[in-house]
Curated annotation (Swiss-Prot):
Entry keywords, A to Z: Activator, Cytoplasm, Nonsense-mediated mRNA decay, Nucleus, Transcription, Transcription regulation
Gene: PNRC2
Residue numbers spanned by region Disordered: 1-51
GO cellular component entries: nucleus; P-body
A matching Pfam family: PNRC
Short sequence motif named SH3-binding, residue ranges: 101-107
Polar residues bias: start-end ranges: 11-21
The organism's place on the tree of life at top rank: Eukaryota
Name by which UniProt lists this protein: Proline-rich nuclear receptor coactivator 2
Amino acid sequence: MVGGERFNIPVPQSRNITKNHQQLKNRQKNKDQNSQMKKTYMKKERGHGCNSLSGAWQAMQKAGKNNVHFPCNQNWSPNLSNRNLFFSPQTNQNYAGAKFSEPPSPSVLPKPPSHWVPVSFKPSDKEIMTFQLKTLLKVQA
C-alpha cells in the first residue's frame, strides 16, 4: 500500500436502510407519545380549572346578560357611585411628591462633574447649555 492510495470498502446498504428506518419509526413513536401526553395534560388542566366555575358559568348563561343579580351589600352607599367624586380634582389633599407640570428650578438640579464642563464660559455657551437643558427637561416631563 502506497502513501496516497485509498481503498473504498463497500458498506452493505441494507443495514443502513434498516437502521435509518428504525430511527424514523422511533421518532414517530416519540412524537405520538408526546402528543398524547400533551393532550391528556391539557384535558386535566382544563377540567381542573373549569369545574369550579362551571356552575356559575351555566347560571350566568341561563339568567342572560342583563339579568345578573349581585347580592346586596349593606356597606355600599349610592353617594360613592357619583362620577364627579372620581373625576373631580382633589385639591384638599396634600401631595408631597414633585409636580410634573412645573419644571424644577436650576438651583435644585445636580451640578455636573468639573471634568465635564469647560473652565471658561462664553455667554453664548451658557445660552446653548441652558437651551439644551430645558429641552431635555421637556422631553423627560
